[in-house]
């Protein structure tokens, strides 16, 4: 083939290659945005999905009365750190494999340290199965720990998972964390392998979807009047504190 023919062929295919590159870049961008939104949490997109009205559009994060009705009430069945009769409830929908949840975990702990008995922390399961395949097994493991050893063991287990997700999200790691939380190894293994609490995990997830949660962490601040504020994503402690103070002063 002559040099002129090669040049002509190259010129002919250059626009095609350029178009293909643009299309590929577009789809990569869409995929990245979707994954990022899922992990960053909150209720972004809830209005479009007709899950819980326009929760994401609530001014200053405060929900309307109709929106608040969609958030499942806190009960004795919940995993609660503190008293469910505290002035403030922090209800978090979370995923044990989510890196943003790992980032938010110490932020929530800091709130409990500062506000003491004024606040309680409620943890609910919201595994993002499509991108976090170890989140649901970890949630099932946590429920096993709670059933076998109680609430304190559950929170110790959760703290361990979020202290080192890479280490503890394997089957062996979950077992190690369970034993360190006070559960007998054989008892845990029997419960975990039976996938005993999958329906409980799913019920938490469905409740979150009804409330408008589409990603993790997605949290609500609730005061004694039943007023609620949305806390979308792994917000800073300063942002969380501002919402708590607003709820206390309302």
Positions of predicted regions on the chain:
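C-terminal cap of thioredoxin/glutaredoxin-like
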Residues: 2-43, 175-250
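N-terminal, intrinsically disordered, polar/charged segments of Gram-positive cell-envelope systems
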Residues: 38-72
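Extracytoplasmic/periplasmic mature domains of Sec-exported, cell-envelope-associated bacterial proteins
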Residues: 62-71, 77, 134-137, 239-242
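A short beta-strand-turn-helix
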Residues: 71-88, 113
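A generic local structural motif
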Residues: 75-78, 107-108, 205-206
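Short clusters of hydrophobic/aromatic residues that line enzyme substrate/ligand-binding pockets
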Residues: 80-81, 168, 231
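Conserved strand-loop elements at the edges of beta-sheets that form or border functional pockets
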Residues: 83, 92, 233
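Structural alpha/beta surface segment adjacent to cysteine/selenocysteine redox centers
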Residues: 86, 91-96, 102-179, 211-214
